[in-house]
């Protein structure tokens, strides 16, 4: 079965420079760097397996004649919201994902975002490039507020693989970690977790690491932001839909928050008029990065190794990382 598989990669450019040679050595592979929605059906046609990262596979496509040979969807990511899992399950199409591959990369990037907001290294670098240091009347520049992390509190919302690694790294800086219970739960949760509202009230920094679900959409809204400490920081390297963008922008404009850093938006790539993209060009206390927290070279290699293992398991009739 393995040698007869026909596989199509729909958005291989998202894997960067990671080699796909092991796939092409084993199976008949077609590799597309990007796939627009209108191109998906044609490229899926006649294929046994789809490998994708963020291309949308909905019920309409799965119902079309193009998908009649489709047996497996290999999601090269942890999140599965771009694939209609129920529709795939109903049609006997196996769907697998790759959990945990980028935990170290995302945690490291999260800490980098915290450090950037706390120390403004990038801002000072920009001032030097602009010639501001040469014109300074004193030996230094003190244009940006900065603070030490030691003795501050970090609230972590979402305590899976990534949240745990962030907590481990944060303790090395002397941060106290406060772990939020699942949204909607009452009282202390497992492992001494605190109600979300209490974490928001007590934390100097709040970092989001939970999945986007109907329960967590706009989890950080105007009400949640009002609970946060004056001068607190917000970090979101999870999902854009967790935060009400307009409410966040207002809190930053009014200086109720000292800063925010987001690596994810509700639409990616964003349109030029996305509220957070526009605000990032105006506000010096907002940092937006292009959904790259996951993308360390080691994480991308780990991702493709796991996708390969998922497909190999499928050829043996075994379940591995199956989500539908």
Where are these regions (language model features)?
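Short, conserved active-site loop motifs that form the nucleotide-linked donor/cofactor pocket
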Residues: 27, 93, 191, 285-287
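Rossmann-like adenosine-cofactor binding region
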Residues: 57-63, 176-178, 182-275
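Short, Asp-centered acidic motifs that coordinate Mg2+ and/or phosphate
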Residues: 48-49, 72, 205, 233, ...
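N-terminal Rossmann-fold NAD(P) dinucleotide-binding loop
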Residues: 163-164
């Amino acid at each position: 079965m393995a040698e007869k598989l026909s596989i199509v990669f729909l958005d291989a450019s998202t894997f960067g420079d990671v080699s796909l040679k092991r796939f092409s050595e084993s199976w008949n592979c077609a590799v597309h760097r990007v796939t627009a929605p209108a191109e998906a059906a044609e490229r899926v046609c006649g294929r046994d397996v789809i490998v994708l990262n963020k291309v949308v596979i909905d019920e309409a496509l799965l119902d079309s004649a193009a998908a009649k040979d489709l047996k497996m969807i290999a999601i090269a990511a942890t999140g599965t919201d771009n694939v209609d899992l129920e529709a795939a399950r109903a049609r006997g199409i196996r769907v697998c994902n790759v959990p945990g591959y980028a935990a170290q990369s995302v945690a490291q990037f999260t800490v980098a975002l915290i450090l950037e907001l706390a120390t403004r290294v990038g801002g000072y670098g920009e001032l030097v490039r602009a010639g501001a240091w040469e014109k300074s009347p004193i030996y230094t520049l003190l244009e940006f507020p900065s603070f030490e992390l030691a003795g501050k509190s970090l609230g972590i919302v979402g305590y899976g693989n990534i949240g745990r690694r962030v907590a481990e790294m944060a303790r090395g800086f002397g941060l106290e970690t406060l772990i939020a219970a699942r949204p909607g739960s009452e009282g202390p949760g497992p492992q001494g977790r605190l109600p979300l509202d209490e974490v928001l009230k007590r934390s100097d920094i709040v970092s989001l690491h939970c999945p986007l679900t109907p329960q967590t959409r706009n989890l950080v809204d105007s009400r949640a932001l009002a609970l946060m400490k004056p001068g607190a920081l917000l970090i979101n390297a999870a999902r854009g839909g967790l935060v009400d963008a307009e409410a966040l922008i207002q809190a930053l404009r009014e200086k109720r928050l000292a800063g925010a850093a987001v690596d994810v938006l509700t639409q990616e790539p964003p349109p030029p008029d996305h509220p957070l993209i526009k605000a990032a060009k105006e506000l010096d206390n907002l940092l937006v990065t292009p959904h790259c927290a996951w993308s360390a070279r080691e994480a991308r290699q780990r991702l493709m190794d796991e996708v390969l293992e998922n497909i190999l398991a499928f050829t043996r009739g075994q379940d591995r990382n199956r989500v539908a």
